[in-house]
Amino acid sequence: MKDEIFKKPLEKQFEFDANVASVFDDMVARSVPFYAQNLKLITQLITHFAPQNAKICDLGCSTASLLLALFEKRKDLQLSGVDNAKAMLDIARNKTSAFGARVDFYEQNLDEFSFFKNDVFVATYTMQFIRPPKRQEIIDKIYQNLNDGGIFIMSEKILYEDVKISKKMIEIYENYKQDQGYSKLEIATKREALENILIPYTQNENINMLKNSGFKIIESVFKWVNFETFVAFK
């Protein structure tokens, strides 16, 4: 289904409910630049770095697009996904079932989730929705529950240190969304709806958060204007 949620003002606070879940795949494909390519890159990273029978946990798995891509590439991987939106997980379960993929799903908030050992944790545009006071604590749990040699892949919308540069980058991004078919009204409505819900960090803030958890090697492997993907190695 096509994302037309923001054609009119929202009557309630934005949340990943059934309405959003039903159009999420279209929404994210049109709202996040190079989303499909970034997902493919993450799949390749995991395929190359994860050991045989590795345990992979997708934090904020939404409709399980990444988990399905991993299943198609490597049948040996033990896959799990966490999301706090029931509507998202309903679609995720239907999609994985249709392809015969065995995935363990958990319906929980990350700050309440009982983390368990994995070889890879992934959070694609997830941490930006976690309240800042809780964010470091969750990254700490990710590090503590990574097996030695494990990796954490994190994609985030980012801010720039310089306010003027940041403003220009946002303008470039909003032009991108117009090119994807969103009207200026839809863009403005969504921006207002996500204010104080999606809270991005700067590149340095994200890197420092990873370092504070114990990660020693942190690399940026993808960046487009105000979107970036980091890989942290334990």
From Swiss-Prot:
Binding partners and assembly: Homodimer.
Pfam (any one): Methyltransf_25
Annotated function: Catalyzes the conversion of S-adenosyl-L-methionine (SAM) to carboxy-S-adenosyl-L-methionine (Cx-SAM).
Keyword Amino-acid biosynthesis belongs to the record: no
EC code(s) of this entry: 2.1.3.-
Top EC class for this record: transferase
Reactions catalysed according to its record: prephenate + S-adenosyl-L-methionine = carboxy-S-adenosyl-L-methionine + 3-phenylpyruvate + H2O
UniProt KW Hydrolase keyword: no
A molecular function GO annotation: S-adenosyl-L-methionine binding
GO biological process, one term: tRNA wobble uridine modification
Name this polypeptide is given: Carboxy-S-adenosyl-L-methionine synthase
Listed InterPro entries: CmoA, Methyltransf_25, SAM-dependent_MTases_sf
Binding locations of S-adenosyl-L-methionine: Y35, G60, C61, S62, D83, N84, R191
